Amino acid sequence: PDFWKMNGLAADEMVVFSDAVHPEHQSRPAHGWFPKGQKMALKATSGRKRLNIQGALDLETFQFTFVEGEKINAQTTRQMLEKLERNNQTMTTIHVFVDNARYHHAKILQPWLDSPERRVKLHFLPAYAPHLNPIERLWGVMHDWVTHNHHYATFNRFTEAIFDFFRKTLPEKWPE
């Protein structure tokens, strides 16, 4: 992929890796210990509501930019890319590595991407290669901290926990 060739970026260029995640409001047993022969009771939630989050991660600064939407589509992709541009005013080029989801190739996104004032440049990772996208590891850490072995009685509490992770825990535990 192109990102291996980007070691010589100018100081006013940056690279981010982007992807979507859809955490579901349900109990996710991941690991635990209890005496042999005993059964473990696990609280469960009713329903399967979920959040739809599209994020972008800068591996140099660990800056995490994200948007939430009713669903992830070309509109939420554009919102996230616009937020990247707003949050990085000093950058002349923002290289964004994405997977090959249909909304990244959407016709309605192309005119916006092609406009001369755009500083975002999309780079597509190979198909079926999530292991090449470092943000996938962040999703795993989020699940370890927030969803695995946790129960949230309400969807609002679940939503708070997810956003607290991104807004508070992530910047505090993994500082610049």
Regions found by a protein language model. Name each.
Residues 1-82:
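Extended, low-complexity cationic-aromatic segments
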Residues 10, 59, 91, 115-119:
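Short, well-ordered coil/turn elements that cap or connect secondary structure elements
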Residues 12-15, 135-176:
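C-terminal anion-handling pockets and recognition modules
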Residues 19, 81, 92-105, 128, ...:
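Acidic/histidine-rich, metal-coordinating catalytic segments
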Residues 40-46, 114-134, 150-151:
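RNase H-like polynucleotidyl transferase catalytic core
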Residues 106-116:
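Short, aromatic/basic amphipathic alpha-helical patches
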